[in-house]
Amino acid sequence: MSSFITTAVVREALASIVREMRRAMVRSSYSSIIYEGYDFSCVLIDAKGQLVAQSGEDHPFHIIPVAASVTRLLAMHSDIGPDDIFLHNDPYTGGTHLNDVAVVWPVFVANELAYFIVIRSHWADIGGMTPGSLSGGAREILHEGLRLDNIRVPKSGASDTLRLIFDNIRVSDEATADFHAVLGICRVAEERLRRLIDKYSFEVLNQSVAELLDHSERRMRASLRDLPDGEYAYVSYLDGNDPSLFPLQVAVKLTIRDDTAHADFTGTSGQIPAPLNAGPAIAPTSVLTILKSYLDPAGSITSGTLRPITVHAPERTILHACAPAPCGGLNEVRFAADAAVLGAIAQIIPERVTGDVRGTSNHTYIGGFDPQRNKDFIFYEYPSGGTGGWATHDGNSAVRAFNEGENVSIQSTEVVEAIYPLRILQNELRPDSGGAGKHRGGSGLVRKVEVACPEARLSVLSDRNIIPPSGVNGGRSGAPNCFEVLRDGKPIPVSAFPGKVTSFPLRRGDVVVMQSSGGGGFGPAAERDLSLIVDDFADGLVSAPSLAAYGARESAGIVERGMTDLSDEASASIEWRNDDAPAHECGVSAALAQRLGLTHGSSIELAMLKGPSLRAWVDRIEAGNAATVHLSPNLRRFFAGSTVTVRSLGSQRPALTAGTHR
């Protein structure tokens, strides 16, 4: 048995190997999405397929599914050899989306399979229907590129299989260069691992790893034991797109029993022929990410962390998709799953949670031919937004959130203009984007990119363009994401559905405008300190009209408290429906509809002073002169009183048609 000190040293040594891998990736990769965007992750996996080491900087949705990828590999291949490596990106068997390709490098000790070194990185293109492979228009996974389900290739990197892969993707020179960089990094990581084995012995190293996994398990069990037993349900929503007709939902029931947690996603929308699906590894990733972040943020993540947690996501839902469902927007689904689990634990520990984050990756691709450099190009960016406000501080602005690892906010202007036929015209924080609250949500950003080549194509895969990130404990929602193209200074239509653009033709001089959402607010905005409101106004983060949300106003440049009448908020009496309508459908009285400007299909928010806000869509308007809202009995558990604050979210539900998704 290894000693406590030896185990601690081994833990840090393994993490050091992974950190060195990360630094080498940044220094040696060819594509800017790696060396500027940090869209990659590195981990060490043991021979049983268990995650044993990561750097603390890696992306959760990269590293947690890796264990599932390797478990699949072990089931598929019983003849793994020391000269083999494997490529994996298949979302149905532990992958994320097709662009995220994992290189799995086995390590043998005395002819025994000992460990796997894994680097999962985003390839700029993996084939498919559009430059960059990701788009809002995919209807099946074949539209998104090549599926690689643990494809065996030699460690030398020379094979007809690899040639076939690189011959069928765009900008293959970037992918080839990055791939060979990964091979070199894995070789060095194997050398570092062998030195560690030589120093402590293979037996002691395995004993230390076993103790590390057990320690992670004990930490998570202790955190869960502090929570009251019970069942806590919540539903989060995605915008959806044309095939889904109206918002998709991720429903979760989180059951806490002693030192265990079980998340049941029954009630989640069925998979759809659109890129808003995720494979089976994503639901456990969301549950672990939220529980770890809010209950035990210290300490490393290993497969031991997941042992007290069980997850059920029904097959053929957007959280457990099967072929041929496209999964390019798996991160949009993951953000919704994160929000659902966050809404569940906000009912348990409302004082410790935050408002929601921007809720999407905002995949943005501009691709075409660069005549000046005489080659094809693909510019890929995912503009970050605001994070949620919390008990003691405002959210952060234009940064990656806690559930995104070390990925950077945006690529630098200098690098973009040096290697692409593009000009960056504007980078700034987006006014009025952070959700109002006692502690405001962080601001999103505004980024304008001008096309400087004769023609190009734009694809966008985003969410939360209709349904904004929610606040908590009475805090308000952040502004939704927004994408548009300016031609001759005027906006032009680029898609039938917000945030879903497929290969839209751009001309020289067109300007792509990306506006990312802000985070949700924490606590009632009327409780915000006036000095903070003054600072926000002076900094341009809150405009004069938006001061009303804080119970403030501006006069002659002076911000002061004052009586304000909010046009988007009203107190309403609750009446309970006696039909079988789902929880997200509600009725409102004619008086409330007139007060808030609601019509059939309008979306509303039910603000809870303690815990998460709820979302609903108006399916009928009742006669009545009093402000009332007619809710499903399924929501009774959220309400102790007979009134609720109702806010208009300003968005319309595309359709309420019999037989459509609910």
What does each model-identified segment do?
Residues 91, 517, 609, 649-651:
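Short, surface-exposed secondary-structure boundary micro-motifs
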Residues 1-82, 90-109, 113-567:
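Glycine/proline-enriched, intrinsically flexible loops and inter-domain linkers
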Residues 111, 609-611:
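Glycine-centered tight beta-turn/hairpin loop motif at sheet-sheet or coil-to-beta transitions
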Residues 86, 114, 506, 512, ...:
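Generic structural signal for buried aliphatic residues
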Residues 572-607, 615-649, 658-662:
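Short beta-strand-centered segments at strand-helix junctions
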Residues 541-559, 634-653:
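Glycine- and charge-enriched low-complexity intrinsically disordered segments
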